[in-house]
Amino acid sequence: MSKQDLLLEIGLEEMPARFLNESMVQLGDKLTGWLKEKNITHGEVKLFNTPRRLAVFVKDVAEKQDDIKEEAKGPAKKIALDADGNWTKAAIGFSKGQGANVEDLYIKEVKGIEYVFVQKFQAGQETKSLLPELSGLITSLHFPKNMRWGNEDLRYIRPIKWIVALFGQDVIPFSITNVESGRTTQGHRFLGHEVSIESPSAYEEQLKGQHVIADPSVRKQMIQSQLETMAAENNWSIPVDEDLLDEVNHLVEYPTALYGSFESEFLSIPEEVLVTTMKEHQRYFPVKDKNGDLLPHFITVRNGNSHAIENVARGNEKVLRARLSDASFFYKEDQKLNIDANVKKLENIVFHEELGSLADKVRRVTSIAEKLAVRLQADEDTLKHVKRAAEISKFDLVTHMIYEFPELQGIMGEKYARMLGEDEAVAAAVNEHYMPRSAGGETPSTFTGAVVAMADKLDTIASFFSIGVIPTGSQDPYGLRRQASGIVAILLDRNWGISFEELLTFVQTDKENELLDFFTQRLKYVLNAEQIRHDVIDAVLESSELEPYSALHKAQVLEQKLGAPGFKETAEALGRVISISKKGVRGDIQPDLFENEYEAKLFDAYQTAKQNLQENFSKKDYEAALASLAALKEPIDAYFDHTMVIADNESLKANRLAQMVSLADEIKSFANMNALIVK
């Protein structure tokens, strides 16, 4: 079958860098999905993007759809043929419905029953006759943010300026918002000009001639190579932030790296401020020496060539100098502050219109933190540190520096607190109470920081739940899922055996059930990330108490034992107790009502297991705890072999069920064994 290459390029006004890659991938997925849907075979797919274009190249696209041959099944033979062997109306109707004649029908047996069948054949259409449908594919792309322009109804990420659509050397004809498809694309805005693409395979090279590097991976490698060359030539170290590298890559069509300098006196400003100014505000790469100390230089990437590059460097230096001068001023002004005066200013900042001011939040956090510290048996000095850290945790939010650099909240707070004489533990906690700042991020390194972080996150979650702001689907505007995951991460990192139920006693809430379910889902998410089996997760989360540290370690022990010899039988015995216990109620067990020795032996085994489990759990020895439960298997099996739990005598029945309920409670303190899938 003959084949042709396919090229589709959407030319746009400059797109936001953060949306570029996912938009390119979406276009590629939609195009290959369309080809598959249309039964059009193809070869290699290559994706391109720049701030002004999204493009897909598909090699060896078939010039014709595959023919479709399939067998259609009709009515059963006994319905399709009458007594004389003639086709019935049912058979005739089936053949017409399939576009066939009755002469094409045949009988075939399926699972012992004979049915009427017909072979269907649909000849494939020429690909070029279908390709104009790509206009709908282009307009179907979804973006996080859209706009309208002119009098057009189409909402799109940016106005469409040109479209290149080629199948082989032929243009695929269609139009979108009065833009006709063609073969003309645009080169670099300043260094290139219009160019007519000869064929899809020539696309990348022809654009390169117009100072456009269409392949984002090639652009990225160019930037990395230029950074490495500069570092080697100047004996520098350039710590490359992958997110920044990707963003810069998606801001340019033809990258040329250059470096500039700033006055060394600016190095007296905290490094975090300098780095944030360069990376977040200017998209510059900071420069360090081989010892990791910041140098008064930066690297930026120009969208163009090296023409007049010294002037470009001077211009960037001027912009950075102005920003650093502002930062220096803010830093000096903030050193005049009084922490307690700043805390009072929090009264004038609204946390949320239904939840009061930031000062109100700080008071709630302080109360929770003190209760939590007492629960964790903190000494008197540590309690004072926790209280003070919670009270001043938000003081830096009213500083000049955080007004300008909100991403440095906590970080600058720690520096200012230390500078103004706060205890080291208190200063560190001002920063650490925001940790972890992202999923999988660093957790607080100090006890005080961990306690205040837990309190702050717990208050945020409980407060928003109290006013009905509960995450649903993809909607989580206040990042409550991240906050809950942060609480779980801290509990696991600090080995604190505090259950969700106990945590909720530290806050005032009427949404306890909703909060427990929410925290359980976040714990399930964390356990999934640890590659724990789904049935094991369900088993431990159905235990009597939801406590992250024990849940993780119980799950890990269960996973290790699942394939062990005899574990299947043990799990079945323990699960049998849980199942039958559902028919009873919790009550006192009366040994004088035992009718055989096996009831007594199981009662003794239960008491031993209960005592052992208390000791195992207090030592956090979950392997020993599972062994304590495994020791119940034989007395459980013997009990069921010789005892009818659902006895005719109501007193005996109630006593035996009470024994099952008590035993099930101990088993479920580890896990619900019935949730396990053991083979």
From Swiss-Prot:
PROSITE patterns, A to Z: AA_TRNA_LIGASE_II_GLYAB
Protein name: Glycine--tRNA ligase beta subunit
Keywords: Aminoacyl-tRNA synthetase, ATP-binding, Cytoplasm, Ligase, Nucleotide-binding, Protein biosynthesis
Enzyme class: ligase
PANTHER family the UniProt entry points to: GLYCINE--TRNA LIGASE, CHLOROPLASTIC_MITOCHONDRIAL 2 (PTHR30075:SF2), GLYCYL-TRNA SYNTHETASE (PTHR30075)
HAMAP family (alphabetical): Gly_tRNA_synth_beta
Subcellular location(s) of the protein: Cytoplasm
GO cellular component, one term: cytosol
Catalytic reaction annotation: tRNA(Gly) + glycine + ATP = glycyl-tRNA(Gly) + AMP + diphosphate
UniProt feature coiled coil, ranges: none
One function term, GO molecular function aspect: glycine-tRNA ligase activity
GO BP terms in the entry: arginyl-tRNA aminoacylation; glycyl-tRNA aminoacylation
Principal localisation: cytoplasm
Assembly: Tetramer of two alpha and two beta subunits.
Family membership: Belongs to the class-II aminoacyl-tRNA synthetase family.
Enzyme Commission (EC) number: 6.1.1.14
InterPro entries: DALR_anticod-bd, Gly-tRNA-synth_bsu, Gly-tRNA-synth_heterodimer
